[in-house]
């Protein structure tokens, strides 16, 4: 895990925003369905909640970067830790159809703050430069203040993007977090 941030949203829920990098060291096979555990603890070290999510396919030798958010319902965590992805023998697949992270590119074309809403709207597009269609693509927004990650969010584009194709997206993120720059990342997610 590169970074995490904990904030309260407009509903006074405790939202954990994480940014991850994951590498497939295997150069012959894609890896899929790696399980990553998250543990949230309070200031006394007591575990408030544990959860997990599954990594999607990572092409041979590739590194992916993405955001993940989780709402902690059992109190405000003061620390977050993650486990290394766990895999089984069935996690390793033929690499045919696997898209490398650098074969998807995303850009933000507009950031706006609609009147009456407590959200910023990030509009943009993602281009698939791979020779394979991207069946599902995760778009991650990483917000920074003075170069430090202060929040992140993501959405899943479930409409396939054909090879050489482009798709538009809009992501809404709470205005409760002050930022002065952002990154947008497209990650193959199938």
Language-model segments: what does each one mean?
Residues 13-20, 117-123:
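Short, solvent-exposed loop/turn segments enriched in Ser/Thr/Gly
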Residues 22-28, 126-131:
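Asparagine-centered strand-capping/turn motif at beta-strand->loop junctions
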Residues 28-33, 47-48, 77, 131-136, ...:
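Short acidic/proline- and small/hydrophobic-mixed sequence motifs that coincide with surface turns
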Residues 32-36, 135-139, 180-182:
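Short beta-strand/loop motifs in extracellular/secreted proteins, especially
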Residues 38-42, 141-145:
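Conserved aromatic beta-strand anchor motif in extracellular beta-sandwich/beta-rich domains
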Residues 48-75, 151-177:
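Intrinsically disordered, low-complexity Pro/Gly/Ser/Thr-rich segments with frequent PxxP/GP/PP motifs
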Residues 71-112, 175-190:
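Terminal connector regions
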Residues 99-138, 144:
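Short, solvent-exposed interaction modules
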